[in-house]
Amino acid sequence: MGWLRGIALLSLGVLLAGRVNCQHVKNNVPRLKLSYKEMLESNNIVNFNGLANSSSYHTFLLDEERSRLYVGAKDHIFSFNLVNIKEYQKIVWPVSHSRRDECKWAGKDILRECANFIKVLKTYNQTHLYACGTGAFHPMCTYIEVGSHPEDNIFRMEDSHFENGRGKSPYDPKLLTASLLVDGELYSGTAADFMGRDFAIFRTLGHHHPIRTEQHDSRWLNDPRFISAHLIPESDNPEDDKIYFFFRENAIDGEHTGKATHARIGQICKNDFGGHRSLVNKWTTFLKARLICSVPGPNGIDTHFDELQDVFLMNSKDPKNPIVYGVFTTSSNIFKGSAVCMYSMTDVRRVFLGPYAHRDGPNYQWVPYQGRVPYPRPGTCPSKTFGGFDSTKDLPDEVITFARSHPAMYNPVFPINSRPIMIKTDVDYQFTQIVVDRVDAEDGQYDVMFIGTDIGTVLKVVSIPKETWHELEEVLLEEMTVFREPTVISAMKISTKQQQLYIGSATGVSQLPLHRCDVYGKACAECCLARDPYCAWDGSSCSRYFPTAKRRTRRQDIRNGDPLTHCSDLQHHDNPSGQTLEEKIIYGVENSSTFLECSPKSQRAIVYWQFQKQNDDHKVEIKVDDRMIRTEQGLLLRSLQRRDSGIYFCHAVEHGFIQTLLKVTLEVIDTDHLEELLHKEEDADASKTKDATNSMTPSQKIWYRDFMQLINHPNLNTMDEFCEQVWKRDRKQRRQRPANAQVNTNKWKHLQENKKGRNRRTHEFERAPRSV
């Protein structure tokens, strides 16, 4: 009788589950979505959960040669092993008690501001790093010894050598900073005062006098937030090298109606030493241009993503022309969205060689400068390549004067293909970080993007060309939760040597591999449908793709993801997926409900169901109605009827490929037949269970009558009324029990409460079911 009781309870549980609305699968959802628990269980993540007295693991420095990841945090600098970040060394660098007290007396937060937050961490030479921190609103810098060779295993601070950090690190830990250390000189975009109002791009260290941008001139910098700094060669002559700063700032007056934020790219020459009579110890080659990342709209009205969040440079064969990837978000509080735009340095240089922005006319508006531009052109580095000047101090006065009053370019820099390569507007998160890896696949090279979000997830996205390489399709491969609690991802580094990704947040550091081919499945079709450039079918499993591997059994199709073409010769023609079909037999009771569970691994797959009657080869597609409800987890059948008996097939359609996931045989038992079976089994077991029956309570003896009434009343309102009658009857019976019986019942109830944590399945068939 146990199997019948199990059927009945299953039917009753589904009936009480209520209605579930079917949601259509969206095309822009991740193919695989892995929770933090799933990442841990599959051993695909390593976590450093931080120290009790530290936080803010935001400043990363990757050293592939030493196989170390250096991380600057609150009062600490860490040296993590790239293979396993659980192996690390640390340096404690707090502020003195007097500094902390001064910070507190200035009205700052003792925990969130009055500490030493590491903001600069750069390679100084072969043996030392250079580090700067906020120092409780007194910036300071020092040197970290790391040894000459990886095997030296040295990691210590030079306690006797501290420097003033003004112009290198911000005072306020909440402010962003961008820095670059080249040839012993530190280039920093930061705030240089206690109040956080004097923003500038500095060059410090080295043998030359410190140099900076013009002070208190909004045409140069207007309340900027610096993102990153990069050295990009201009030509084969090192004298032409330029430093590029990426930042966002408030739009200049007259540049935009109302208050707005603009993303910028700024340039300075590496050999700029300031002017002779004007712009002394100030940049003479500083220029800036706006970065556009927008979606073209109707009537010429574009949707702009102006809040630049992060930048990644993808190096190419030509070091002068890396591809610039930028992550942007919207400024609007109403419309929340993120985008990734891609820029070429050719377009950037074209803008810097274009017209300068100039204010003119009755409305004093910004227009392209139409007058004579002095020679050599402002913004050009002094070298033998573009002129005969040896130093910026030799430049004519008219060049310096023009550069001082015209730091901005009129034309903006548009992205490649004039639109973003990825947009997200229908989600509850925004992009914060990006790193990119260029991967060799069977049919070409692909850029795989790893995008961090403000809720602690990482998106793995590949850009795939459509008809041409200029039209790109973004395929969201995975969404991975990499921290236990939602948190903003504030730093990311990629190690192509270790094939690992490192992620930083306020709470800790996480490490995960760039590829997890086994998560896609154990069949050729599943591996092919994944369209992951890292992975290919090797004849027996979905594994890491290597260009040097044998091609005879290797299957990979990133551009089209067509398993029919690439997997049909490896398997039987009727089953090119190579996947074993799961088969089930389910029993249901007439007039009740049952649920056929079928959920594909891929979230991009669209599920549809087919029905086949017994002894009939004809299959018909199931149409959704009031009785047949399709959900993301399967098919809900309400008010079962005899004609519902048959075979149900669950199919998944993805990228034009149909895959059968499940075959379910449903047997519907009518209520009269079920009652007859129950009574027959009761009579057959009567002699064997006489003693047990005598010991049963009245509520247990009438269980079948209760159950049959429930089956015959599938309406939830009627069931509520019936349950109320059962509860009233039980209360009446308890009141009529003798006092000693009541005491024993209370003891038994107490024991039951003590055992609530035990697995209910263990005793499911050892007790009679409760009254509803």
Curated annotation (Swiss-Prot):
| Residues modified by glycosylation | N53, N125, N591
Q: Where is the signal peptide?
A: 1-22
Q: Which SMART domains match?
A: IG, PSI, Sema
Q: Which GO terms fall under biological process for this protein?
A: fasciculation of motor neuron axon; motor neuron axon guidance; negative chemotaxis; negative regulation of protein localization to cell surface; neural crest cell migration; neuron projection maintenance; positive regulation of cell migration; regulation of synapse organization
Classification via SUPFAM superfamilies: Immunoglobulin (SSF48726), Plexin repeat (SSF103575), Sema domain (SSF101912)
Disulfide bridge map: C103-C114, C132-C141, C269-C381, C293-C341, C517-C535, C650-C723
Recite the UniProt keywords alphabetically.
Developmental protein, Differentiation, Disulfide bond, Glycoprotein, Immunoglobulin domain, Neurogenesis, Secreted, Signal
Its cellular-component GO annotations read: axon; cell body; extracellular region; extracellular space; glutamatergic synapse; plasma membrane
| GO molecular function terms listed in the Swiss-Prot or TrEMBL record | chemorepellent activity; neuropilin binding; semaphorin receptor binding
Q: Which residues form a coiled coil?
A: none
Where does it localize?
Secreted
Residues in Ig-like C2-type domain copies: 576-665
Q: Where is this region: Disordered?
A: 730-772
Summarize tissue expression.
Answer: Expressed at relatively high levels in brain and muscle, moderate levels in lung, bursa, and heart and virtually absent in liver. Collapsin-1, -2, -3, and -5 bind to overlapping but distinct axon tracts.
Task: Using the UniProt record, give the first listed, main subcellular location.
Answer: secreted
Provide ranges: composition bias, Basic and acidic residues.
750-772
Sema domain sequence ranges: 31-514
| Its biological purpose | Induces the collapse and paralysis of neuronal growth cones. Could serve as a ligand that guides specific growth cones by a motility-inhibiting mechanism. Binds to neuropilin.
Family listed? Belongs to the semaphorin family.
According to its record, what is known about the domains? Strong binding to neuropilin is mediated by the carboxy third of the protein.
Q: What is this protein called?
A: Semaphorin-3A
Query: Encoded by which gene?
Result: SEMA3A
